Every structure is written in C-alpha cells, then in structure tokens.
Amino acid sequence: LPNPYKLNSRRDVLIETISTVLKEQKILIDEASSRPGDGIIVTQPFVFAKGPVITQNELKRYAVLQFADNAWSRGQFTLTIEVQSIDGVQNNVSVNAKVEGRAGNGLTSEWATVQSSGLAEEEFLVKLVEAVTGNSLDEPKTTDQ
C-alpha cells in the first residue's frame, strides 16, 4: 500500500478507528507522546519477538539488518501514525515504525535501532484500511522503497 495512504473519513472518526485497530492488535497508545488533536498517535513499544532463535528471524522480517552476527534477544517496534487532513472528508495517513532489537555481546545488552523493512507499517495500514472501508485486502506485500 502507498504510505501515506489516502482515506475517506472524517478526521476525528479516523483517529478513533486508529485507536480501535491498535487495541485489536494489542498495541498500546503512548498517551504522553500522542497528540490526537494534531492527528498524531504514538504507540508504546510493542514487543514482537522474545528469545534468540525467534528474534533473529522476526527481526529479519521487520528490519533491514546490517550485521547478522549480533546476538538478538528481543525485538520491538514503536509506531508513529500521522493523519493529515486534505479536506473535510479526505485524509492522508502516514505510518512510520521505529524498529529496535536488543543485542547482547556477552557482558551487556542494549536496544539498538535498526532500519525498518516497512512490514510493521504495511501490516497496520492493511488493518486500518480494512476497518475504514470494510474491504478485505490481500496479505501485506513487501515493496521496494
């Protein structure tokens, strides 16, 4: 899907729909960072992988890994969703994901930000478009950016 994606819906209704879709995905909204009145919703970090075996594979899906030799133990992403009003009923919705992996080198482990592959953004946009339009879309496709 294009990102930003144009949706026909009143902005306040769209913000409410975004909140509902996030709840359905069990992703919590960071109330302190979000500004719904300005059309900005920020989520709390969503852990999508735990454990070294699963995390390595899931991070390869959600991120572009520069170095494959890190010992990843967890993966998480934070979504920033921005609704920009075009006119009374049309809005552009852009979704950006900050993807992080918890990497360890034996003595310490720390969260490292890695480049998003676009999968987290695509998965959310597909669910949002389905919620707004009522039409079921195909599974998310990876696209060259």
Which stretches of residues belong to each language-model region?
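Ser/Thr-rich, low-complexity intrinsically disordered terminal regions
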Residues: L1-Q145
